[in-house]
Amino acid sequence: MASVSSKRIPGIWSGIGWALADKSAHFPSRLQLAGRALRGALWHGKALRRWMAMVFELRARGIVTDLPSEYLRALRPYVHSGTGVSIRVVQLIDHADWLETALKPAAFTQITSDAPVMLADLPPPRGYQFLRLQLQRAPAQSTEGDLLLALVLQRSPEVQQRAAPVEVATIAFSRFRIEGQGCFVIGGVRGQRHPVLRLSQVELNQVLSGWKPSVLMLRVAQELARFWGLRLIGLDPAHHPVHRWP
């Protein structure tokens, strides 16, 4: 989606046109997202104007580049069903404010440039060039969180020429306040999703020394939450809308 070049803050009604032009819209469809933008402008105008001003400021500072996609974060389906637009805006602003203080300046610049930040370079097993824990910003279309914590490995050139990095496990999460307390809110835990760049179960067990990827990543999330002074919160499966509009 093309970014907006105007030096004036766009009105929230622009969100309807942005939704209709959103090429990434599969779930929800463009019409569904545009309907959400219309209802949001009618019923949650104050919250959305606040979010529009925030995104405009972030774009002016070079922290985000695609203003329409960032604005639509507040209107897309969220993994916790029943989260209204006004609450979602508060969560997004809280997360954006926290991220700038949680990371060192160099890491913040890196992650806002959509480049992954390496948190730990782990000893790679034999036959692998590296095994890393990295943090990166989630795509604007993500329904599960605003950051991705990923375990990434790459085979050594002796084993595979021009090997590409493989994400073997990922946690999607956000940071916002619940009942006044800062929380590390997990929205999704997933394994390998790439149709080609993937490891067999046997190879994965060898690489992780028998650890299940999801269990290992949750342990890492616990340590990160402790480091940041956050409460670790998981999602109640009863509130997880997988194939429906929240």
Sequence positions of predicted segments:
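Non-catalytic substrate-recognition and accessory regions of acyl/acetyltransferase enzymes
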Residues: 2-203
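Acyl-donor binding region in acyl/amide transferases
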Residues: 167-246
